[in-house]
Amino acid sequence: MEDFNSQYANHSKLEQLKQFILEHGTYIELKKGEQFTIQGKVNHRGAYIEHGLLRYTRVDEKGNIHIVGYTFSGEFTGSLCTLIAPDQPSLVTIEAVCDTKICYMPYSKVEEFFAANVKIMQLKCTLVEQSYLLMYHRLLDMYCKTTEELYLDLLNRCPDIQEHITLK
């Protein structure tokens, strides 16, 4: 599904969360190659990407590194596992592909935001629902699309990605 990440990040119900992070979070610039999250370590923060590109990788049991996704400007990033279960280590490493400006916030502050009232708590449900839909679409794409189709989808989402990475 083309541009599903953007549809998820720009979901109308998540606008409040985005604004909260942008108003109360901390802005930093990740340099190319700098890691935001490390596989196997507990990550206590999530972020909104102002501009730039982040790559998600996972190291398998044999030590091979697999690229499992990207997030782009205008999207959320972080370890959903840690948001749901705070002591759960990250399943992926998230690193900057190019200089990337993000606004991050500790998950504890995000949880305080969610706990403000029932209506805001529903935002957490929306976040988890949208994350599930995103992952389900990616799973279906992985099984149903050819490598070429996945490549074209990535180019459609981010036409200038070839300036930052080598696509094999």
Label every PLM stretch briefly.
Residues 29, 47-48, 95:
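Well-ordered beta-strand positions
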Residues 58-63:
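Cytochrome P450 core scaffold surrounding the K-helix E-X-X-R motif
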Residues 26-41, 71-75:
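Conserved short histidine dyad/triad with adjacent acidic residue
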Residues 1-27, 81-82:
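Cyclic nucleotide-binding regulatory module and flanking cytosolic helices
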Residues 96-97, 108-168:
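Polybasic "coupling" helices that flank or enter modular domains
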Residues 67-125:
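Cyclic-nucleotide recognition modules
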Residues 23-24, 35-45, 64-65, 87-90:
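A short beta-loop-beta micro-motif enriched in histidine and acidic residues
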Residues 44-57, 73-74:
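Glycine- and acidic-residue-biased ligand/ion/polar-headgroup-sensing regions
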